[in-house]
Amino acid sequence: MHILGIDPGSRKCGYAIISYASNKLSLITAGFINITTTHLQEQILDLIEALDCLLDRYEVHEVAIEDIFFGYNPKSVIKLAQFRGALSLKILERVGNFSEYTPLQVKKALTGNGKAAKEQVAFMVKRLLHITSEIKPLDISDAIAVAIMHAQRLKLY
């Protein structure tokens, strides 16, 4: 089973695909979609095209998306919600369903502490998947963490 984890962002959207087979999790691919244009419509199209390419290249059975973190800038939250809505629609179209998890849920599931720092989450991701190299930017480790949490929720791992 392949699980796609997504950490949506307004400039970088982290993604990771993990595999569950023979009672073991492994990382298939991870990276980020870099959003460079400044026009909202183009940003959304770039994001959706990149997600389409990812879904064309890899077979995905389950998708988990990190829920929006409500910051202090309402304009940023609205923009992020628009990106997330576009991602959700594309995932429903291509995969059929997705699950959502808050940052607090993901941090608690991986570290035991819902207020853990991103670096602590990255440490646990590396430990659980036996990754020896550094994971940068942290959007990538967040996406991997979302996928791992989803595997835990499905009682796969």
Curated annotation (Swiss-Prot):
Main location: cytoplasm
Catalyses which reaction(s): Endonucleolytic cleavage at a junction such as a reciprocal single-stranded crossover between two homologous DNA duplexes (Holliday junction)
Source organism superkingdom: Bacteria
Residues the entry annotates as binding Mg(2+) 1: D7, D139
Note describing how the cofactor binds: Binds 2 Mg(2+) ion per subunit.
Gene Ontology terms, MF aspect: crossover junction DNA endonuclease activity; DNA binding; magnesium ion binding
Signal peptide start-end: none
Keywords noted in UniProt: Cytoplasm, DNA damage, DNA recombination, DNA repair, DNA-binding, Endonuclease, Hydrolase, Magnesium, Metal-binding, Nuclease
Cited Pfam families: RuvC
Task of the protein: The RuvA-RuvB-RuvC complex processes Holliday junction (HJ) DNA during genetic recombination and DNA repair. Endonuclease that resolves HJ intermediates. Cleaves cruciform DNA by making single-stranded nicks across the HJ at symmetrical positions within the homologous arms, yielding a 5'-phosphate and a 3'-hydroxyl group; requires a central core of homology in the junction. The consensus cleavage sequence is 5'-(A/T)TT(C/G)-3'. Cleavage occurs on the 3'-side of the TT dinucleotide at the point of strand exchange.
NCBIfam families noted in UniProt: ruvC
PANTHER family (UniProt xref): CROSSOVER JUNCTION ENDODEOXYRIBONUCLEASE RUVC
Protein name per the record: Crossover junction endodeoxyribonuclease RuvC
